[in-house]
Amino acid sequence: MSRLRWIVIGVLFSFALQAEAKHFIHIQEDASADQKTAVLILNGFGGTKKGCQAQMAFWADRGMDVFIPDVLLRSSLKESSDALEAFVEAQHLEDYREVKAICYIAGAYLLHTQLETHPMANLTRIVYDRSPTQERAPQTAMARIPKLGMLKLGKVLRDLSVATWPDVPESDQLKKGLAIENRATPLMRFLQEEAEAMGPLVYDWQAIDPTAHDAFHVALDHDMMYVRWDVLGEPFLHFFEHGVFPADLPRDRIHDRPFDPTYPLPE
């Protein structure tokens, strides 16, 4: 079987797993919302059932209520945004003392759209998963494998590939941090030519988001960012508490071989 066919089968399988995901919610019943902090995790296309389970396994034991909505895969990006709006309203996130968010790529689009029309005065932290390679997935997939992408993700993939992104939220109480992937997924290695044709890959965190307060680089790919809480958990908790990441984490690009699958992974 050709390498291309194996890759396509793998992509189909990973997209199929995404379709299984549902809301994951953990609520502590020992206090009212105005005495608690909520963690809102907004996944992207990589938010599989396995990924959500790994997220919940780490975050449910951290003294906060945890909300992982399944809102992305709808018939359009507009319906995805509407689904998030309905989820936030149904869970009464405005009642919490604080809300701290983790946003993957498409999840960031949904959060920013939500905040344009429904500002959250209690939102105090956002950690963004940023990936110079994976952020080109919608455009490159639509360029090379549009039928496959549309088959599994529908119009949302197409919509996101041409979407104008909402402004990045800013407020006096909000601190934003970036976790920057330095490794490409198998999908993006397959789409390397299309990704590189879009222009230079930018890894300078202050160029990626000039409004961010801090960042760190990690030798993980996008799929791993959903499950490697042994690597990501403590840095994210530290940012939630202090508004900065631990001082010993790398602020500069780790290596210049994002498409090299042999580069060592974090232990």
Predicted regions mapped to residue ranges:
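Bacterial N-terminal signal peptides that target proteins for export
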Residues: 1-7
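Serine-dependent carboxylesterase/thioesterase catalytic core
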Residues: 40, 59-69, 78-173
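C-terminal catalytic-base region of ester-bond hydrolases, centering on the histidine
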Residues: 170-267
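Short beta-strand/turn micro-motifs composed of small residues
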Residues: 43, 103, 180
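Short, surface-exposed "cap/lid" segments of acyl-processing enzymes
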Residues: 24-27, 31-66
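Hydrophobic h-region of N-terminal signal peptides that target proteins for export
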Residues: 11-19
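Acidic-and-aromatic substrate-binding clefts and catalytic sites of carbohydrate-active enzymes
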Residues: 46-50, 72-80
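Short, solvent-exposed loop/turn segments at secondary-structure junctions
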Residues: 46-47, 108, 133-134, 182-185, ...
